[in-house]
């Protein structure tokens, strides 16, 4: 963390070690009970934003004439150690992902800022938990549209000299082709997926090239109008399921956790409503009674702040350490 902060030019203003926290109490049966905190590091980043209207989100645009570009910050490494795939398959001992060259992250940040200033980007999402497959799915869920992934550039056999080179070598049989597909889909190495129009694609790739990221950048997909999540490789469709099916499965983990914490009947109703809403275009709606509407109309307008600023209180949840910045800005 210290090395990254120095190379990236950022600081950690405050922090606390919650990874070693434990709760101890005596149970009803008289036995001593101890629960340790989950060994999961959570880091909250904050920075001033001059114009929130230019913020990028993972919400993919359903426009068909667009492309998805993966910027891979580890030069093709696909380490699976500690990944979701490794956990569910019981695969231990693999090297874990790492940011081997922090300067690539700096270059990516500079390139993204320039691209956004030129209006080249429609959506942005990082590759993290679940790998590229989860990243693409989450973008599709946010935009309520399908996505087709093309993995040819991510599964190139390093031992094949050309497309017609079928000589059998010992090193060629050390890893099955489907293993390369799984590595490409589920490695959790640092990287991002950008969406741009096809008209702007060459300009964006040129900008990435100018920042030394061309070898790390690959066109890997596009939205589709079938509302499906598809994976293609070597001219074959390896996977295809309706987006709504995958989105419901993706939301089920949160639903089960909420069922343990909240009223099960209420969470079941909310989960069912969420599933029904997945077929609708993304929108916000509110239902107000006639009484509520009239009360809103009768509400006096807030006075303009022309003199001394009013006192403002910010309610802070326990354990939240960064909201003091908002207080400083407000003063």
Name each model feature, range by range:
Residues 1-17:
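A glycine-rich helix N-cap at a beta->alpha junction
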Residues 11, 17-188, 197-311, 318-319, ...:
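Intein/HINT protein-splicing elements and their conserved insertion hotspots or analogous self-processing inserts
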């Amino acid at each position: 963390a210290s090395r990254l902060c120095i190379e990236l030019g950022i600081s950690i203003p405050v922090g606390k070690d919650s990874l070693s926290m434990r709760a101890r109490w005596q149970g009803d049966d008289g036995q001593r009970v101890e629960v340790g905190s989950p060994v999961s590091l959570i880091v909250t980043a904050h920075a001033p934003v001059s114009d929130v209207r230019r913020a990028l989100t993972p919400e993919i645009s359903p426009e068909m004439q667009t492309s998805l570009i993966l910027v891979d910050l580890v030069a093709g490494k696909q380490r699976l150690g500690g990944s979701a795939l490794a956990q569910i398959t019981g695969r231990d001992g693999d090297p874990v992902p790492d940011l081997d060259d922090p300067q690539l992250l700096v270059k990516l940040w500079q390139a993204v800022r320039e691209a956004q200033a030129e209006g080249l980007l429609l959506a942005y999402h990082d590759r993290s938990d679940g790998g590229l497959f989860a990243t693409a799915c989450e973008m599709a869920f946010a935009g309520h549209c399908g996505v087709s992934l093309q993995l040819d550039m991510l599964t190139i056999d390093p031992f094949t000299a050309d497309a017609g080179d079928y000589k059998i070598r010992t090193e060629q049989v050390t890893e099955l082709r489907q293993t390369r597909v799984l590595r490409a889909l589920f490695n959790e190495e640092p990287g991002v997926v950008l969406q741009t129009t096809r008209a702007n694609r060459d300009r964006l790739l040129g900008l990435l090239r100018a920042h030394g990221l061309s070898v790390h950048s690959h066109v890997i997909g596009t939205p589709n109008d079938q509302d499906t999540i598809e994976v293609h490789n070597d001219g074959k469709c390896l996977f295809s399921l309706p987006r709504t099916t995958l989105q419901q499965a993706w939301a089920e983990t949160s639903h089960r956790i909420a069922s343990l914490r909240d009223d099960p009947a209420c969470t079941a109703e909310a989960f069912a409503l969420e599933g029904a809403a997945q077929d609708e275009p993304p929108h916000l709606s509110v239902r107000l009674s006639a009484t509520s509407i009239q009360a809103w109309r009768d509400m006096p307008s807030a006075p303009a702040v022309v003199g001394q600023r009013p006192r403002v209180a910010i309610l802070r949840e326990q354990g939240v350490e960064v909201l003091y910045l908002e207080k400083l800005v407000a003063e």
